[in-house]
Regions:
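Conserved polar catalytic motif of the HATPase_c/GHKL fold
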Residues: 49, 53
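Structured loop/turn residues at secondary-structure junctions
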Residues: 13-14, 35, 91
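Conserved beta-strand-loop-beta-strand hairpin that lines the nucleotide-binding pocket
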Residues: 1-9, 54-154
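Generic recognition of short, well-ordered alpha-helical segments
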Residues: 21-24, 98
Length: 154
């Protein structure tokens, strides 16, 4: 049975500047596992895409003067597994299967390419999306890091 060795929770306003904040926080947090550069880039890219999707899509049409947040929970397990849960209380996704198709976008095609979920899926080992219209969306990603080199084999 895997055991949680560390956990981080963030609540950030849904503002584009906070996408970089989330990336920086997760980079520092997962450093304790000493991921490879490729693994770190994968984690940062997947998280960045999930946060950006929340910022761009979750609160579209909502009042600007009301606070809107993105919730991020990251767990590190003794098995060198990392889980990242990104959620919002926004509009939700009506049809997850359709939304996950490459090139699908609810925005203007000239502004959005509809590759967000594909990017998240390709940079992680698993991707799960749950959503309720009018209640929000949760994206759960899992990344398994390469084993630590054993003593003497470095």
């Amino acid at each position: 049975m895997r055991k949680i060795v560390n956990e981080m929770k963030l609540r950030l306003p849904a503002r584009s500047v906070n996408e970089a904040v989330a990336r920086s926080c997760i980079s520092a947090f997962v450093a304790e596992f000493d991921p490879t550069l490729e693994e770190l880039c994968d984690i940062r890219c997947a998280l960045s895409e999930a946060v950006t999707n929340c910022i761009v899509h979750a609160y579209k049409g909502y009042r600007e003067d009301e606070p809107h947040y993105i919730y991020i929970s990251v767990r590190l397990y003794d098995s060198r597994e990392i889980t990242m849960e990104i959620s919002d209380n926004g509009c939700g996704i009506e049809d997850i299967e359709t939304a996950m198709r490459p090139m699908f976008t609810t925005g203007e095609p000239s502004e959005r390419c509809g590759m967000g979920f594909l990017v998240m899926d390709n940079f992680t080992d698993s991707l799960t999306v749950k959503s309720k219209v009018g209640r929000g969306t949760t994206v759960l990603m899992r990344k398994i890091l390469t084993p630590e080199p054993s003593e003497g084999n470095e």
